[in-house]
């Protein structure tokens, strides 16, 4: 039977259409996915993301452990609260998961990992933590609420105590702070400013209702997916998985190669891929005619040598903000500015862009 988050009854009270999402009953929408999408781009919306897994790590060698476990380097994290995005790789360089890691103190770090990969992530982390004597604690006692949009921070702050407002004052993106019972982070999955707030599960429903009263509209998984696609953000299981290299998933920027002596898991395989060159890459596609780009559709183009090449759409949808169809696609190296997508046996032209279409509500790719 599918699990329920602490906000399950709140979703029903707001008329949500519920679906089973990787073993969790989650809201798909509350009546209109399109309205919810625009709500986040233009004002503020909130998402129940309590199905995500929060993992706390503790011990004197936690930093050393994470420098081995993760492709990005936590040596960059020198200011308490600072976070970074990274892949957690297997020995062959495939992506076990993408996650956010927060530096809390020299002996405490926090990870936020995906729900779909929870069991294998926790097993992998725990197994590799043992030689470092790092304590691994899965925080099932916490709920997680994302408040996103241009008005997200101002409206959410009306619910904060004076101490909490002071704690987040001037906080830059990709930081987190514990302020009383709330862990408030300036992160998100929409391309908009906002907060992701972890709080005791027993307090989640009350906080959700306070956000509703403050004018924050609930939004479901449908809008969350089109928002992240417009922002060019990866979805695990589509843009990457254990058989896909981060170099083929627009995650090359999350790999810290120096110092060369840092022996992170997957490094040897990635170095071989990098040396070989000409691997696959993730690109953006924008539809120039009517039609909708869908996951799994083939992408064709002719390379500089005149050879026909084929890739695949990993995520595709209509973009409510741009009014056209957009997609992320994994393709062989050498693609130009135009390609062809086969839709119902029709060859449809698409424009090739960088993987990212909307930032802070504005078009960056058309």
UniProtKB/Swiss-Prot annotation:
Keywords: Aminotransferase, Transferase
Assigned EC number: 2.1.2.10
InterPro entries: GCS_T, GCS_T_bac, GCST_C, GCV_T_N, GcvT/YgfZ/DmdA, GcvT/YgfZ_C, TrmE/GcvT_dom1
Keyword set includes Transferase: yes
GO CC terms of this entry: cytosol; glycine cleavage complex
GO biological process terms on file: glycine decarboxylation via glycine cleavage system
Membrane-spanning intervals of the chain: none
Any one GO molecular-function label of the UniProt entry: transaminase activity
Catalytically driven reaction(s): N(6)-[(R)-S(8)-aminomethyldihydrolipoyl]-L-lysyl-[protein] + (6S)-5,6,7,8-tetrahydrofolate = N(6)-[(R)-dihydrolipoyl]-L-lysyl-[protein] + (6R)-5,10-methylene-5,6,7,8-tetrahydrofolate + NH4(+)
Uppermost EC category: transferase
Superkingdom as given in the UniProt entry: Bacteria
Family statement drawn from the similarity comment of this UniProt entry: Belongs to the GcvT family.
Function: The glycine cleavage system catalyzes the degradation of glycine.
Subunit field text: The glycine cleavage system is composed of four proteins: P, T, L and H.
UniProt xrefs under HAMAP family: GcvT
Protein name: Aminomethyltransferase
Organism: Sodalis glossinidius (strain morsitans)
